[in-house]
């Protein structure tokens, strides 16, 4: 008890627990006591080595942490850094914990500590126990597992996390005022800091310690290292990363990150002495009488563990027990602080400080002017939170269960200290060794550290472990003292083997290493450094580095988000800080931030820019508030944030557990709250003076004499310090402490080894005992077996064998049944019911693919035709018209061509050509700007297809053949391609978006209604006591299933996402609505509301269905033949599409199946044989005596039943090993045919098609039993209902399962046929090992007892799939079937025949067991399923049409529930049954569905010839060229003297000749002046003739009659050419000619030369026709009456001028061309005036109109009338050539069209009305855009131009219709216009004129006005 009282750091280690177990460790029985009023505490878990250290009366109680930073907490009491070599930390990590010795016991020193001279070094008289780092994955349970003691010395399992503010709150007696001799403050350099690497290095097994280096030499190489927090030396492992250079060195405080080499000097900047980060500097009192001597604990090394790549901790250390009481050392020697000397490890124990890239550690430096380096933030697992005095650490501990180390304390500006790290003396470094660097802090002007880290040969970074000389207490030093440099030596990498890793890491090497040289060298270094150690100047205490709000806001400027969430805890407000990365990742603690920064290296954002303190007013603040919708996070305003920050500030922490607390001794000296603990000064005494002082302090009570001795010792020590005589004492203490530590390490190592040996011995003994026990048991079993074997007769063995076979049979049967349950390839199933015979589409002639494209086109035009300008009622062709047009039948070809033109126009507009084809031109014009016609659309289509990468073969065909000459399927594919491209146009996309928006609104409203309806039904059910299901109809029950909405929401994944996004809205509104609905007063009112909402729900459902079906067709699935079932939005019925062209050839399937079959069967057989071995061993003792054949077994009923008939519990047990027998390959094997069986199936095809022989009774019985089995497979999973039902299937009907074989098999013996199942079992096992080769190939060698089946057996075992009538019979008697009869035949000739079993399984068994023949059939069925039956050819092609709802019901019944495809099809058909019935009942008006005979179409498809179609097109182009020639001549536009040749289109020697397509000869080729010969043209090819005649025509058109685009006047150039003449000519040999030409003419000629199709020639022809100025022709004549130039054949030319008049426009009407001359009215008027000679009595026009007399033409002179015969102006208007042939003569008599006399008068009246002065408002239709409201008032508009068009095309059948339209014009005018307006007055004038003229023409006739 006395020793325990003296144990100031007593605590017991926790038992080891799994890191991730989540169990809360039980508290230990240790008790922390106080000595001199200051506690010393070391948390058990956590990777930080901070502890509660008594420093100048300041207790630095650190919370548990998992950070990789090794912190020690010695506090200096001087204003300068007084570092004593004997006062330092030995921080050795990565080694497991070892038991500690009792400090009061006289046990031998631990082996680890014994390696150091002097044994152990107690701390404050007590050896401080080392701490065990927590497991990497134990971050969530660190506090619960740590042992910390607070003010009362009570131990608690809860770790205490606090900062300076918390420390202040916890100690009211303490303060942090700065005394003259106060603790030093530390500052760090703002330069870059080396960081820990993330990989592992191996270390040399040994190294020597180099001689110490003078401080002046060491000052040459400097780098930032470790600083102390509150006087604590912070150890950082300086490592350079080799594999990740971006993580090696990081810029600090805005500096550029740099990667330092291994021997590179790192300059360290001196911090600004004028800047201080202290928030509240204070002074410490000068009185030092009661100040305890500075004490420190020696930190024990940890066991090294293998690095874990994904561990969460930094070092990857597992939890082990802390040092126990028995391992603590005596208290004789005074403590010293040794430098942290860590030799490198050897190769055997390479370890990593970083488990992965996120587990990094580095030295952290806090600067008063700049934030810490990135190494602090990026390369730490759990890093610091740099908040000033904040409680962020505890907040985060409470909310996140993760600990962070305390923040750093930064130096005061006036403090001067130097941290120097001297490199090794030898620059040469071995690639596998790392120097042990000793880090010494000296009070120099600036902190300087000179590291030297050696490279490693492997990918591991060696941890350079430094020895940190912590600042000692300077309380006893005078205010004025000399500055003594403090340096340390760095061991050389070429050190001798005496400096072994075992010195510091005893487990690193098994060999014993001598550490004497290491200790001597260290002592020398300490002697050197101790000579000049002084204290200088006093300064303020600097608190730790904090992150300013400006720094915390920096990440927010780079895409980060910071959120502080505040909620009310049990006693106070709690704040939690969350960070969101730029990618949206949420981070709640520093390890996540560091890991993110390490993986995403960002140079501008570092670790110091983050703070998890909720009191930092940066980011968004959210508060948890109770709202009507529940608890929600509400964002706080800027005014609310300060009050919330004050609310979460205050005293925090968990109250003590008073039940487990022990009474503590009240400290003798009380200190105020926040006052730092007093620092002991025993370390400053020499050994002689310190020993009695320690002995006296260790005692419980001190008498007056002892107190006087202590005071004397202290006074003596202070005098020594003042005289500077304590230097040698410090060096001696350091030397002694190292010896003690070395000794203790050796002792602990020896203890551990002995303990491990004992454990190994115990384990070996236990194993030996177990082995002996097993041998004894085996011997006993063997003896029992031998006795049983000797006692039993020989028949016992036969019975055992039979039992084993029966069990094997059951296992095999169970496996087969399990396989039969699985979904299978539909064509592998043999028990299909026949599908209904669907009727094919009646009028379908096109191939299947072409009809599919036609359906796509029609549905697209119906859905989106209005957007593209189509009128669905007129412009959308039906399927019948589309089919006729594709087959070039009748007038439908023109409609298809017009459809192509309109679709291509829309596609050229949007989406248009791709970007790389935008500049494509033909004849100098952009392709998209060329006017499309039926004649040239083929060439534009070819360019469009080429631009979009359509197959080159089609484009090449279009180069020489027009669109209409292509096969029907190609034309349908082209139209479908245009439709698909238009689907991506902006118009279509916008239309789809509108539809989706409307669907979204409908769906939202439907959900709201459904939610309210559901709540009302719930309320009604509660009030009436009925269930909700009773109140819902069948439709509602189905509607509540999610699958019922699929038909409504077939718009795809985007709508499902829409559903998820909107699904929350109705739920929130629903609560409010439900509250309102629930207040309904009575049940009838609820029922009325339910009825009303049900109607609304039905309305929205229909609207949603209508909107969704407009978007796309619905695929219901596939049947067994892979036919697809389609439901189209506008067409009636269900369409079934064959799989033409989609089936894989059977040969390919066979080849692909071979390897799969072998693998599947090979994996099946070992499981079967292993199963047999297991059964043989387990059922030996369960054998029963032999019984006669036919007798029931004398066994228990449970064991007699087969496995599938046992109780559920036993069935489950039996199924577990069976699951092992089903390899994955078997899942896919049924979908592939087996070649051998397929071959035999083909060889016996004729046999399989037979109907079979008459059935026997036994066959029917077997069919019924199998039907029951199949029903069980489909309907239930219970094993007890195998034979309870009898459902007949097509396969189970009589005569379809066991057809008669082609050859009668050998008659088997009755015994063999009925009793033995072994042949069938062997056949099944052999089938799994058969090769997948052809039948003639011999199988590989197998065991002798495994016969192979014959081909005939395989064929005869194949069941048929033909429907027939079922004959149900009673399943009582069973007889042998042909399948069973084949068993002896298979056994015949087998040399290694298995012995016959005395018991048979062929007979019917009692107690419900099925017969073995049934399972034989199951085996055969299982093997049959491995072969997929071929799809019948008639099911592969074509389209079917389902119109009858009854056919749909029959389809549902016939689908197989086990087929992969038919199962899904059945699901969809049943789900959408009502909707599909509505679709089937739609009216169908398409002619293709009308049954009719189409022999002509069939013949057209069979005799389709593209050459004939192309020849017809080429001939039409030739005729068009000839017409253009005639038109030019008739217009006198040709060069004088040129006449067109005779027509070639009437020649009989014309023949089609196809030109080979050449890409260089393409008309889109842009080459100019292309040289080379033109393509050879043949005079018998219509296309070549058209090209030659067109070229000649262009050259002979007068240039002055040409215009743009071929003849721009500003581009005309004059070219000259020399023509050579014959030599014999008297003139010169050459003749120079000049001609005009334009570049467009040259391009036109080149393009014409390269034309190879009619469409290309039409393009050239059309451009030439547009370039001729027809209006400049002298013969350009228009009718004087109608002012039109059409109908040239009826245009009568005046003999006096070039005017003319149509013979039907002349008044009175002319029946024929008059003889003699004819003069127009203008000429007659001029004759009256004397310009022309006129006969007397010739009336004028005006007189004629009034009198109504006819004109009399004179025939006095010989001039003849002219009739202008002109061709059509455009290719699409009028006939291209005359029926009687064209003549160049000017006059030709033409037969007059037979006009009705009344309609002729109508034409005259209309002509006169159009020429009237008041007719201007009625000449053209009224534009509704210009005249608003016209269409709303005038329902039937009419005008004179519309009347003329109708009159010319024969739209009027009588004059009454004409008069009605004329009066309609005037009535509309009177209705819309006022009478006094101009238009109204004109209408009245025209009405009077029309009525007067009508009376003149119809005098004596009743006019129907």
Swiss-Prot record:
The modification N6-acetyllysine is found at residues 680, 799. The modification Phosphothreonine is found at residues 507, 548. A zinc finger (PHD-type) spans 1676-1726. Keywords: Acetylation, Bromodomain, Chromatin regulator, Coiled coil, DNA-binding, Isopeptide bond, Metal-binding, Nucleus, Phosphoprotein, Repeat, Repressor, RNA-binding, Transcription, Transcription regulation, Ubl conjugation, Zinc, Zinc-finger. One of its GO terms (molecular function) is RNA binding. Acetylation at Lys-680 by KAT8/MOF promotes its dissociation from pRNA, affecting heterochromatin formation, nucleosome positioning and rDNA silencing. Deacetylation by SIRT1 in late S phase enhances pRNA-binding, allowing de novo DNA methylation and heterochromatin formation. Acetylation is high during S phase and declines to background levels in late S phase when the silent copies of rRNA genes are replicated. The modification Phosphoserine is found at residues 509, 613, 1051, 1184, 1397, 1559, 1747, 1770, 1783, 1785. Expressed at moderate levels in most tissues analyzed, including heart, brain, placenta, lung, skeletal muscle, kidney and pancreas. Residues 848-913 form the DDT domain. Residues 35-59, 379-391, 399-420, 725-734, 1345-1359 have a biased composition (Polar residues). Residues 546-617 form the MBD domain. GO terms for cellular component: chromatin silencing complex; cytosol; NoRC complex; nuclear speck; nucleolus; nucleus; rDNA heterochromatin. It is found in: Nucleus, Nucleolus. SUPFAM superfamilies: Bromodomain, DNA-binding domain, FYVE/PHD zinc finger. PANTHER family: BROMODOMAIN ADJACENT TO ZINC FINGER DOMAIN PROTEIN 2A, TRANSCRIPTION INTERMEDIARY FACTOR. Component of the NoRC-1 ISWI chromatin remodeling complex at least composed of SMARCA1 and BAZ2A/TIP5, which regulates the spacing of histone octamers on the DNA template to facilitate access to DNA. Within the NoRC-1 ISWI chromatin remodeling complex interacts with SMARCA1; the interaction is direct. Component of the NoRC-5 ISWI chromatin remodeling complex (also called the NoRC nucleolar-remodeling complex), at least composed of SMARCA5/SNF2H and BAZ2A/TIP5, which regulates the spacing of histone octamers on the DNA template to facilitate access to DNA. This is Bromodomain adjacent to zinc finger domain protein 2A. The lineage of its organism: Eukaryota, Metazoa, Chordata, Craniata, Vertebrata. The gene is BAZ2A.
């Amino acid at each position: 008890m006395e020793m325990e009282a003296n144990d100031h750091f007593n605590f017991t280690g926790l038992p080891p627990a799994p890191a991730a177990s989540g169990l809360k460790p039980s508290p230990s029985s240790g008790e922390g006591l106080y000595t001199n009023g200051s506690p010393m505490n070391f948390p058990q878990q956590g990777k930080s080595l901070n502890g509660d250290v008594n420093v100048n009366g300041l207790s630095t109680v650190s919370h548990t942490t998992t950070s990789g930073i090794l912190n020690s907490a010695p506090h200096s009491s001087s204003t300068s850094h007084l570092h004593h070599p004997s006062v330092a930390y030995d921080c050795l990590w990565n080694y497991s914990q070892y038991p500690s010795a009792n400090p009061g016991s006289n046990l031998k020193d631990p082996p680890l500590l014994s390696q150091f001279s002097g044994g152990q070094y107690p701390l404050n008289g007590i050896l401080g126990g080392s701490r065990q780092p927590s497991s990497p994955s134990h971050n969530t349970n660190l506090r619960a597992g740590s042992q910390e003691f607070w003010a009362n010395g009570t131990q608690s399992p809860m770790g205490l996390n606090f900062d300076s503010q918390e420390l202040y709150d916890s100690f009211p007696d303490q303060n942090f005022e700065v005394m003259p001799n106060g603790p030093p403050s530390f500052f760090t350099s703002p330069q870059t800091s080396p960081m820990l690497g993330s990989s592992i290095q191996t270390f040399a097994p040994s190294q020597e310690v180099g001689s110490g280096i003078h401080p002046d030499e060491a000052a040459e190489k400097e780098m930032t290292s470790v600083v102390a927090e509150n006087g604590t030396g912070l150890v950082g492992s300086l490592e350079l990363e080799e594999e990740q250079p971006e993580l090696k060195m990081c810029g600090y405080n805005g500096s550029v990150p740099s990667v330092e080499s291994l021997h590179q000097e790192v300059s360290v900047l001196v911090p600004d002495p004028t800047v201080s980060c202290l928030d509240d500097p204070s002074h410490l009192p000068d009185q030092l009488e009661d100040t305890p001597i500075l004490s420190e604990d020696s930190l024990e090394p940890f066991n090294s563990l293998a690095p874990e790549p994904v561990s969460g901790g930094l070092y990857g250390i597992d939890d082990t027990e802390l040092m126990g009481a028995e391992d603590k050392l005596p208290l004789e020697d005074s403590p010293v602080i040794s430098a942290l000397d860590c030799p490198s490890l050897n190769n055997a124990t390479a370890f990593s400080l970083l488990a992965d890239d996120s587990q990094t550690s580095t030295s952290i430096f806090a600067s008063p002017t700049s934030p810490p380096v990135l190494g602090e933030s990026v390369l730490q697992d759990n890093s610091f939170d740099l908040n000033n005095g904040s409680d962020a650490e505890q907040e985060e501990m409470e909310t996140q269960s993760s600990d962070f180390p305390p923040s750093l304390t930064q130096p005061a500006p006036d403090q001067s200290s130097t941290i120097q790290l001297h490199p090794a003396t030898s620059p040469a470094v071995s690639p596998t060794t790392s120097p042990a660097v000793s880090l010494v802090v000296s009070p120099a002007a600036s902190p300087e550290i000179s590291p030297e880290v050696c490279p490693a040969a492997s990918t591991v970074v060696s941890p350079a472990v430094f020895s940190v000389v912590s600042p000692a207490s300077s309380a006893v030093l005078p205010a004025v003292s000399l500055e003594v440099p403090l340096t340390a030596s760095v061991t050389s990498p070429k050190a001798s083997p005496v400096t072994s890793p075992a010195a510091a890491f005893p487990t690193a090497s098994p060999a014993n290493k001598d550490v004497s040289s290491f200790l001597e060298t260290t002592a020398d270094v300490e002697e050197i450094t101790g000579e000049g150690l002084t204290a200088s100047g006093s300064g303020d205490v600097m608190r730790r580095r904090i992150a300013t709000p400006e720094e915390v806001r920096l990440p927010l400027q780079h895409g980060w988000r910071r959120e502080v969430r505040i909620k009310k805890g049990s006693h106070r407000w709690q704040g939690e800080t969350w960070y969101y990365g730029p990618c949206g990742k949420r981070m709640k603690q520093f390890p996540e931030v560091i890991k993110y920064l390490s993986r995403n290296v960002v140079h501008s954002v570092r670790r110091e820019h983050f703070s998890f303190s909720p009191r930092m007013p940066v980011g968004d603040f959210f508060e948890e508030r109770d709202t009507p919708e529940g608890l929600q996070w509400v964002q706080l305003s800027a005014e609310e944030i300060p009050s919330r920050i004050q609310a979460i500030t205050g005293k925090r922490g968990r109250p003590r557990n008073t039940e487990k607390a022990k009474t503590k001794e009240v400290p003798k000296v009380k200190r105020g709250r926040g006052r730092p603990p007093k620092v002991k000064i025993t370390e400053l005494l020499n050994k002689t003076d310190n020993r009695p002082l320690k002995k006296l302090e260790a005692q419980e009570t001190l008498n007056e004499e002892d107190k006087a001795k202590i005071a004397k010792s202290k006074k003596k020590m202070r005098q020594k310090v003042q005289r500077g005589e304590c230097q040698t004492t410090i060096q001696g203490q350091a030397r002694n402490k190292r010896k003690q530590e070395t000794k203790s390490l050796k002792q602990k190592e020896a203890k551990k080894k002995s303990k491990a040996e004992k454990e190994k011995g115990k384990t070996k003994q236990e194993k030996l005992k177990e082995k002996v026990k097993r041998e004894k048991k085996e011997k006993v079993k063997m003896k029992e077996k031998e006795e049983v074997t000797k006692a039993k007769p020989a028949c016992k063995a036969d019975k055992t064998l039979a039992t084993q076979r029966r069990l094997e049979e059951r296992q095999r049967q169970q496996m087969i049944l399990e396989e039969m349950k699985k979904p299978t390839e539909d064509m592998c199933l043999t028990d299909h019911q026949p599908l209904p015979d669907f009727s094919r589409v009646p009028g379908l002639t096109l191939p299947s693919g072409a009809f599919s494209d036609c359906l796509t086109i029609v549905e697209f035009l119906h859905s989106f035709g209005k957007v593209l300008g189509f009128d669905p009622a007129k412009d959308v062709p039906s399927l019948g018209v589309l089919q006729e047009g594709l087959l070039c039948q009748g007038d439908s070809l023109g409609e298809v061509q017009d459809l192509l033109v309109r679709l291509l126009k829309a596609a050229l507009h949007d989406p248009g050509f791709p970007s790389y084809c935008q500049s494509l031109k033909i004849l100098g014009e952009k392709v998209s700007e060329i006017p499309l016609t039926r004649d040239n659309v083929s060439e534009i289509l070819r360019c469009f297809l080429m631009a979009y990468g359509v197959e080159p073969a089609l484009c090449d065909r279009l180069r020489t053949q027009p669109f209409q000459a292509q096969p029907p399927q190609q034309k349908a594919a082209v139209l479908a391609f245009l439709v698909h491209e238009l689907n991506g146009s902006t118009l279509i996309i916008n239309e789809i978006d509108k539809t989706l928006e409307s669907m979204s609104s409908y769906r939202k409203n439907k959900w709201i209604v459904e939610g309210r309806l559901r709540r009302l039904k719930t309320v009604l059910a509660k009030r009436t006591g009925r269930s909700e299901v009773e109140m819902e109809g069948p439709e509602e029950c189905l509607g509540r299933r999610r699958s019922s909405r699929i038909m409504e929401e077939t718009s795809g994944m985007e709508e499902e996402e829409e559903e998820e996004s909107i699904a929350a809205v109705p739920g929130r509104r629903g609560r409010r609505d439900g509250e309102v609905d629930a207040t309904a007063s009575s049940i009838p009112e609820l029922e009325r509301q339910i009825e009303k909402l049900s109607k609304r729900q039905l309305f929205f459902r229909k609207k949603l269905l209508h909107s969704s079906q407009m978007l796309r067709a619905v695929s219901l699935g596939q049947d067994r033949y892979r036919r697809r079932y389609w439901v189209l939005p506008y067409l009636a019925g269900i369409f079934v599409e064959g799989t033409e062209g989609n089936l894989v050839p059977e040969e390919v399937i066979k080849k692909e199946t071979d390897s799969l079959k072998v693998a599947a069967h090979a994996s099946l057989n070992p499981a079967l044989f292993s199963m047999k071995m297991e059964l043989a061993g387990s059922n030996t003792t369960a054998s029963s005596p032999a019984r006669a054949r036919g007798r029931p077994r004398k066994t228990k009923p449970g064991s007699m039943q087969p496995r599938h008939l046992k109780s559920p519990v036993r069935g489950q047990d039996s199924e577990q090993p069976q699951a092992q027998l089903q390899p994955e390959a078997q899942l896919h094997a049924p979908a592939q045919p087996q070649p051998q069986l397929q071959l035999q199936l083909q060889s016996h095809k004729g046999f399989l098609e037979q109907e079979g022989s008459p059935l026997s009774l036994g066959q029917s019985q077997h069919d019924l039993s199998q039907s029951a089995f199949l029903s069980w497979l489909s309907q239930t999973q219970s094993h007890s209902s195998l034979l309870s039902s009898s459902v007949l299937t097509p396969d189970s009907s009589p005569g379809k399962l066991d057809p008669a074989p082609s050859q009668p098999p050998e008659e088997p013996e009755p015994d063999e046929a009925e009793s033995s199942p072994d042949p069938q079992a062997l056949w099944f096992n052999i089938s799994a090992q058969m090769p997948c080769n052809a039948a003639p190939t011999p199988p590989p060698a197998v065991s002798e007892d495994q016969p192979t089946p014959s081909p005939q057996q395989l064929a005869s075992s194949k069941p048929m799939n033909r429907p027939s009538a079922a004959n149900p019979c009673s399943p009582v008697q069973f007889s042998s079937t042909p399948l069973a009869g084949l068993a002896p035949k298979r056994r015949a000739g087998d040399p290694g025949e298995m012995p016959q079993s005395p018991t048979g399984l062929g007979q019917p068994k009692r107690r419900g067991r099925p017969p073995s023949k049934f399972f034989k059939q199951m085996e055969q069925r299982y093997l049959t399923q491995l072969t997929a039956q071929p799809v019948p050819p008639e099911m592969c092609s074509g389209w079917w049409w389902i119109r009858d709802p009854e056919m749909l019901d029959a389809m549902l019944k016939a689908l197989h529930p086990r087929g992969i495809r038919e199962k899904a099809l059945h699901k969809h058909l049943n789900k959408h049954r009502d909707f599909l019935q509505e679709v089937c009942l739609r009216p169908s008006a398409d002619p293709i569905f009308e049954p009719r005979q189409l022999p002509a179409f069939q013949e057209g498809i069979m005799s389709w010839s593209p050459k004939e179609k192309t020849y017809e097109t080429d001939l039409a182009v030739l005729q068009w060229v000839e017409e253009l020639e005639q038109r030019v001549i008739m217009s006198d536009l040709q060069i004088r003297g040129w006449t067109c040749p005779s027509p070639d289109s009437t020649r009989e020697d014309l023949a089609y000749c196809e030109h080979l397509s050449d890409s260089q000869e393409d008309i889109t080729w842009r080459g100019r002046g292309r040289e080379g010969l033109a393509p050879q043209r043949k005079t018998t090819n219509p296309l070549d003739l058209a090209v030659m005649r067109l070229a000649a025509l262009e050259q002979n058109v007068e240039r002055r009659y040409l215009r743009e685009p071929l003849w721009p006047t500003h581009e005309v150039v004059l070219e000259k050419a020399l023509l050579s003449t014959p030599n014999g000519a008297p003139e010169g040999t050459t003749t120079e000619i000049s001609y005009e030409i334009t570049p467009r003419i040259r391009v036109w000629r080149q393009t014409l030369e390269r034309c190879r199709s009619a469409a290309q020639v039409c393009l050239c022809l059309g451009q030439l026709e547009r370039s001729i100025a027809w209006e400049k022709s002298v013969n350009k004549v228009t009718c004087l009456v109608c002012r039109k130039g059409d109908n040239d054949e009826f245009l009568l030319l005046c003999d006096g001028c070039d005017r003319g008049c149509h013979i039907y426009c002349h008044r009175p009407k002319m029946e024929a061309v008059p003889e003699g001359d004819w003069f127009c009215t203008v000429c007659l008027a001029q004759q009256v005036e004397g310009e022309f000679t006129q006969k007397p009595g010739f009336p004028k026009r005006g007189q004629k109109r009034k009198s109504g007399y006819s004109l009399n033409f004179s025939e006095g002179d010989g001039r003849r009338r002219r009739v202008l015969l002109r061709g059509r102006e455009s290719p699409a208007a009028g006939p291209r050539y005359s029926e009687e042939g064209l003549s160049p003569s000017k006059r030709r008599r033409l037969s007059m069209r037979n006009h009705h006399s009344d309609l002729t008068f109508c034409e005259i009246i209309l002509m006169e009305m159009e020429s009237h002065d008041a007719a201007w408002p009625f000449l053209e239709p009224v534009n509704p855009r210009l005249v608003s409201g016209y269409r709303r008032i005038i329902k039937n508009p009419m005008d004179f131009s519309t009347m003329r068009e109708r009159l010319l095309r024969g739209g009027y059948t009588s004059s009454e219709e004409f008069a009605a339209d004329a009066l309609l014009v005037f009535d509309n005018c009177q209705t819309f216009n006022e009478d006094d307006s101009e238009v109204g007055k004109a209408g009245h004038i025209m009405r009077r004129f029309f009525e007067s003229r009508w009376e003149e023409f119809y005098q004596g006739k009743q006019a129907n006005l």
